[in-house]
């Protein structure tokens, strides 16, 4: 089983790819898709589309986990929702099963509390993946936490 966790955004889309092999969780790749602030929004969305397609074609995940987005009154809300729509479209076009999790669900599953801190989440990601140093940048660590939430739901604790 191979899963991609995705932390949506317009400026940065975090991703983390984990494989289960002999009941061990193995980190295959993590990072961010960054779009330049100097580009037009439609070009940034297209960049997410292209880069995510490349990642999926390279790693062939069998499932995906994406952070749910809740409406907040913010000038970036619409942009993030549009980026999330592009992400969901790419996953649907590849026939990848998608699970969605709220930030509180992710925190509860990974760190044992729906109000866990960023450090608690990072520590849990490092522990679960047997990492010596934290994944960078933070968006990729968040994406790994999202993927680990899905794996936990599927019984890979």
UniProtKB/Swiss-Prot annotation:
Keywords recorded for this protein, A-Z: Cytoplasm, DNA damage, DNA recombination, DNA repair, DNA-binding, Endonuclease, Hydrolase, Magnesium, Metal-binding, Nuclease
Cofactor(s) of this protein: Mg(2+)
Chief place of localization: cytoplasm
GO molecular function annotations of the record: crossover junction DNA endonuclease activity; DNA binding; magnesium ion binding
Co-factor remark: Binds 2 Mg(2+) ion per subunit.
Catalytic activity, as annotated: Endonucleolytic cleavage at a junction such as a reciprocal single-stranded crossover between two homologous DNA duplexes (Holliday junction)
Positions annotated as active site in the UniProt record: 7, 67, 139
Gene Ontology cellular component terms for the protein in this record: cytoplasm; Holliday junction resolvase complex
Binding site for Mg(2+) 1: 7, 139
A biological process term (GO) from this entry: DNA recombination
Assembly with partners or alone: Homodimer which binds Holliday junction (HJ) DNA. The HJ becomes 2-fold symmetrical on binding to RuvC with unstacked arms; it has a different conformation from HJ DNA in complex with RuvA. In the full resolvosome a probable DNA-RuvA(4)-RuvB(12)-RuvC(2) complex forms which resolves the HJ.
Record protein name field: Crossover junction endodeoxyribonuclease RuvC
Species: Prochlorococcus marinus (strain MIT 9301)
Lineage: Bacteria, Bacillati, Cyanobacteriota, Cyanophyceae, Synechococcales
